[in-house]
């Protein structure tokens, strides 16, 4: 397992380098002065042309691109991501505040999808071709077909505007910093984010359970006189759970990408809304850096998928 883990980690290195090279190249092609993306805008606007040129020389902005890339990559490793052109804020500080919010939202969506998707699929498999099974199948198709932002608007209208049970946006109440307060703000966006995955898991759980029910070892267990409860839980569900969990974890990178739209709908202060705000303001340094961070987070999520898959299915390690 250690050898497999090391191999997967080493495979990340060239991928991360490619991402950083692309981001650096795009930043270099942006119109305007590269110095304005390196220092705070207020400081840049107060400098004369002579001072700007002297600073460009001292910071190596006139050096060949490959030297600039090495220096820029080294600054990234130290947490120096530059400054926003629209707000003048340090991009690293912006990320430090936004990234944890997106991670919290994604993990909650994953938990919601895992619990409800597997539960609904489990029940549907036991009630095959019953009205409950047809309702579950129809709901799954609806959950997969309708975009997440529609559910977001619908949830806001029902639970915030009409019922007034939950806040329509934000991350926490001013002056209150507790887990349950943040949970109150996260429950709607996380549920909307996880609806598609819940529907997918429900259908996959049902089909996997039905497939396992037809296996010879399940028939043998019934022939031995085991109770239906023991057959389902110990022989059917246990053997069906491994591929189901693989599907659940494999969708983690897609959840990270889906936060962009959901955070905008609920005005949730995470990475997704940060990217959209930067695009609206034409703040390309922030757009490129946040895109790079999301891509790297997605790569690490994919690494977790590979490791989790290998833990559940040892055959993967030897492929």
Indicate where each model-derived feature is located.
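Hydrophobic secretory-pathway targeting helix
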Residues: 2-24
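Alpha-helical transmembrane segments of integral membrane proteins
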Residues: 2-3, 99-132, 176-319
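Membrane-interface helix starts
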Residues: 10-14, 18, 65, 107, ...
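Hydrophobic alpha-helical transmembrane segments of membrane transport/permease proteins
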Residues: 16-70, 163-181
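Alpha-helical membrane-inserting segments
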Residues: 18, 22, 26, 116, ...
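Juxtamembrane/transmembrane-helix interface segments of polytopic membrane transporters
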Residues: 23-27, 32, 152, 156-160, ...
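An internal, D/E-rich "acidic patch" concept
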Residues: 61-118
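Membrane-water interface segments at transmembrane-helix boundaries in multipass membrane proteins
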Residues: 137-200
């Amino acid at each position: 397992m250690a050898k497999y883990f090391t191999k997967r980690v080493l495979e990340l290195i060239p991928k991360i380098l490619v991402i950083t090279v692309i981001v650096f190249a795009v930043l270099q092609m942006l119109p305007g002065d590269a110095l304005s993306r390196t220092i705070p805008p207020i400081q840049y606007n107060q400098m004369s042309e002579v001072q700007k040129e002297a600073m460009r020389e001292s910071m190596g902005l006139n050096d060949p691109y490959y030297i600039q890339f090495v220096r820029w990559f080294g600054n990234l490793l130290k947490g120096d991501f530059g400054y926003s052109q629209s707000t003048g804020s340090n991009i690293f500080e912006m990320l430090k505040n936004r990234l944890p919010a997106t991670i919290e939202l994604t993990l909650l969506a994953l938990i919601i999808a895992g619990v409800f998707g597997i539960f609904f699929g489990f029940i549907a498999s036991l009630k095959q071709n019953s009205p409950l099974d047809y309702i579950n199948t129809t709901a799954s198709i609806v959950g997969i077909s309708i975009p997440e932002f529609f559910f977001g608007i619908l949830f806001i209208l029902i639970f915030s505007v009409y019922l007034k049970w939950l806040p329509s946006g934000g991350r926490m109440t001013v002056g209150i910093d507790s887990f349950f307060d943040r949970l109150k703000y996260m429950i709607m966006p996380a549920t909307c984010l996880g609806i598609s995955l819940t529907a997918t898991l429900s259908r996959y759980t049902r089909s996997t359970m039905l497939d396992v029910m037809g296996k010879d070892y399940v028939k043998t267990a019934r022939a031995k006189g085991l109770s239906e409860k023991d057959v389902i839980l110990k022989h059917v569900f246990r053997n069906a759970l491994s591929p189901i969990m693989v599907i659940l974890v494999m969708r983690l990178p897609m959840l990270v990408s889906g936060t962009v739209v959901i955070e905008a709908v609920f005005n949730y202060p995470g990475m997704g809304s940060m990217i959209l705000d930067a695009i609206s303001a034409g703040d390309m340094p922030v757009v490129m850096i946040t895109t790079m961070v999301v891509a790297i987070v997605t790569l690490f999520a994919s690494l977790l998928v590979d490791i989790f898959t290998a833990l559940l299915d040892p055959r993967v390690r030897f492929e």
